[in-house]
């Protein structure tokens, strides 16, 4: 297929048009008084959302070059969401502002490479100031505040997340599910999560979230590598008779065995999923034993004189629900005896007390948290399916952002933290590096301005007022007042601000240093010629068909 090439300003201007359109759709969701975006779906009812990344993911433009620009910024929004759980709209607004300012200067003759260097130095300096200004998340109240803001100012969600963290600990596992009714609920169930995802995406049962869920499932645990189907065929036949799903946790599953499992899963013959065993070496054996105790199963190991070919259904663990994504497996409601679990916890605590290695101690504490902490399940209620999906997305975002806050600390929210950090940065740069530095200094005002605009205020006036002051002074867009942001509980996770700025600068630098674009030319399909009508004269005789 023929390709078209566009160069320099022509290419960058089209890329900018794509970024602008994406930005204009996403920016309206920003802040406590951000607006909703209605998205048409290929089937079913349209979805309504105030989540920036959900809007960005839906955008595809007809112009191929503009679409490339939009897709690059869309990727930034997604990466920010994956890493920090929030800040997608901030990253998009920053990327657009940096690209817009940079494009103006490069069109006027600035050197893109020097500009990029100045931008990188400015961003690094601002991030260092953000780190200095951050403070650790203290008690439950601050966790509630962070979660509330990330859930678009929904205090009930904020409280649920804080309660969940209080019950399972800051490092505990928290999952989000749909409730049966319209009320939100919090359940804490015994469970465990480990960092191994499904071995094949064909095991997925929920294509939208790319997760596999098995309810009331058996669990096969082995420290052996499974490469031949005959190793597990007898056991598969026995579990099929029971009519229950099966999760296989093994050192590895490969070749014929994995292919056969996938094919039978796709055909609907087996309800099955497979993951690699967590950990390595001796630690893997211990973690498999932890899972066995939690689920009431037995690790099938040749060291214990057990083989897969002769394994019985009684050796399998059982769990009420198992959820697997590409990175993690969560086992909820394991059917092991509580006394066995308690004994195992005591055993691990004894090992922690006796070990001298910091690394071993850390790994033992991780195992202890997995065994004793359980899993908190937040059940989200709503009156309709559309509302349920929107609310569930908000809870997921709030949960990720809260974990980010616990991890790296918090800064003042409402877009003020970037401005305060920038006020303390004074770099002595020259020529086009200075241009890059000034681009960042102007662009970091954009998030606060957009929050104010969405709330019905003049963005420029609000930014000027905030810049006149120092410390925790900022703008509360919910009521239009200037307040002490920490006292009002208007806070953001440092990780969210940091990653949003880093990603925005990264993609803007790529776009500004782009000198050519290559895309396929859409070929217009020729309209087919009309068929020859010459033989239709005989149709006069059709009168007899009456």
Curated annotation (Swiss-Prot):
InterPro entries, per database record: Chaperonin_Cpn60_CS, Cpn60/GroEL, Cpn60/GroEL/TCP-1, GroEL-like_apical_dom_sf, GROEL-like_equatorial_sf, TCP-1-like_intermed_sf
Positions of transmembrane segments: none
Enzyme class, UniProt record, top EC level: isomerase
Major location category of this protein: cytoplasm
Cysteine disulfide partners in this protein: none
EC numbers: 5.6.1.7
Catalyzed reactions per annotation: ATP + H2O + a folded polypeptide = ADP + phosphate + an unfolded polypeptide
Binding annotation for ATP: 29-32, 50, 86-90, 414, 492
One Gene Ontology cellular component annotation held by this UniProt entry: cytoplasm
Function: Together with its co-chaperonin GroES, plays an essential role in assisting protein folding. The GroEL-GroES system forms a nano-cage that allows encapsulation of the non-native substrate proteins and provides a physical environment optimized to promote and accelerate protein folding.
Protein name according to UniProt: Chaperonin GroEL
Organism of derivation: Helicobacter pylori (strain P12)
Highest classification ranks of the organism: Bacteria, Pseudomonadati, Campylobacterota, Epsilonproteobacteria, Campylobacterales
């Amino acid at each position: 297929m023929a390709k078209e090439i566009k160069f320099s300003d022509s290419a960058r201007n089209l890329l900018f048009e794509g970024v602008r359109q994406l930005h204009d759709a996403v920016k309206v969701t920003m802040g406590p008084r951000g607006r909703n975006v209605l998205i048409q779906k290929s089937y079913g009812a349209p979805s309504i959302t105030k989540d920036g990344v959900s809007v960005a993911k839906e955008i595809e433009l007809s112009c191929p070059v503009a679409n490339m620009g939009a897709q690059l910024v869309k990727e930034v929004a997604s990466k920010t969401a994956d890493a920090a759980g929030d800040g997608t709209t901030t990253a998009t607004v920053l990327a657009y502002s940096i690209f817009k300012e940079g494009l103006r200067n490069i069109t006027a003759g600035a050197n893109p490479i020097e500009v990029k260097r100045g931008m990188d130095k400015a961003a690094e300096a601002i991030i260092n100031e953000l780190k200095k200004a951050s403070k650790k998340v203290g008690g439950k109240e601050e966790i509630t505040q962070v979660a509330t803001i990330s859930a678009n100012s929904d205090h009930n969600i904020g409280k649920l997340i804080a309660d969940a963290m209080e019950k399972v600990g800051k490092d505990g596992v928290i999952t989000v599910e749909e409730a049966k009714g319209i009320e939100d609920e919090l359940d804490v169930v015994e469970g465990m999560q480990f960092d191994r995802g499904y071995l094949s995406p064909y095991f997925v049962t929920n294509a939208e979230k790319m997760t596999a869920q098995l309810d009331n499932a058996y669990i096969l645990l082995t420290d052996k590598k499974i490469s031949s189907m005959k190793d597990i065929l007898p056991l598969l036949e026995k579990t099929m008779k029971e009519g229950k799903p099966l999760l296989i946790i093994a050192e590895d599953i490969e070749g014929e065995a994995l292919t056969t499992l996938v094919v039978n899963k796709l055909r609907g013959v087996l309800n099955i999923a497979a993951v690699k065993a967590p950990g390595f070496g001796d630690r893997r054996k211990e973690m498999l034993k932890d899972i066995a105790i939690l689920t009431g199963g037995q690790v099938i190991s040749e060291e214990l004189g057990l083989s897969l070919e002769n394994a019985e259904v009684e050796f399998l663990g059982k769990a009420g629900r198992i959820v697997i994504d590409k990175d993690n497996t969560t086992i909820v409601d394991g059917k092991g005896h509580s006394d066995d679990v308690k004994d195992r916890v005591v055993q691990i605590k004894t090992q922690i007390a006796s070990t001298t290695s910091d690394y071993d101690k850390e790994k033992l504490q991780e195992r202890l948290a997995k065994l004793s902490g359980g899993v908190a399940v937040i059940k989200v209620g709503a009156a309709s399916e559309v509302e349920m999906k929107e609310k569930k997305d908000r809870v997921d975002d709030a949960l990720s952002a809260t974990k980010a806050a616990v991890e790296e600390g918090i800064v003042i929210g409402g877009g003020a933290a970037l401005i305060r950090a920038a006020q303390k940065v004074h770099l002595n740069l020259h020529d086009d590096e200075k241009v890059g530095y000034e681009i960042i200094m102007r662009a970091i005002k954009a998030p606060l301005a957009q929050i104010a605009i969405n709330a019905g205020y003049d963005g420029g006036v609000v930014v000027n007022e905030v810049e006149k002051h120092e410390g925790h002074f900022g703008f509360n867009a919910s009521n239009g007042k200037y307040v002490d942001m920490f006292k009002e509980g208007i806070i953001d996770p440092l990780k969210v601000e940091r990653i949003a700025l880093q990603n925005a600068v990264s993609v803007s630098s790529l776009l500004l240093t782009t000198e050519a674009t290559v895309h396929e030319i859409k070929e217009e399909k020729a309209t087919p010629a009309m068929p020859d009508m010459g033989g239709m004269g005989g149709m006069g005789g059709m009168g007899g068909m009456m």
